[in-house]
Amino acid sequence: MTNVFIDGQAGTTGLELASRLAKREDLTILQIPEDSRKDLSARSAIYTKADIVILCLPDQAAVEAAEAIGDKCKVIDASTAHRTHKDWTYGLPELTSAQRQRIAGAEKVSNPGCYPQGYLLLVRPLIEEGILSAETLLRCNALSGYSGGGKAMISKLEKTPCNDEGMVSRIYGLNLDHKHVSEMQI
């Protein structure tokens, strides 16, 4: 039996992941009391019991958790904090022919973002085959629902009265300052 701790289980991603993993008979999902969810020392005690820790936390909290975990167990990070970090393996098995093996043997795996994943799977093969130059300037137009913004954004937008004017798309990231840009350049 593999012990899994979902750090951030009460968040949007953590809840969905816990629901899916609960169906697996080969996994035991380790729990933490609700009043200890943000207590790093309480979470650290659970890290030592886990074979795998899945971080479903905001970026800074994921960095702090990863430091506390160290080499105690395998870690999968769903945040953007470690996606381009040199000591983490990018969790996109289709990225290269050897990536699946890298992921299988890795101690620290960063979960790819949705936009970068789609972008990389489309553009990278074109560059590798010489069909597209790596220097070509590209634009990625993408739309998302608000759930991608996490619990705070969901709460804010669900409390806002629904009207046509308030439901239009919002433009952002036009100055290449979006958090996924560096990941899309892998």
Positions of PLM-derived features:
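Oxyanion-binding "anion nests"
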Residues: 175-186
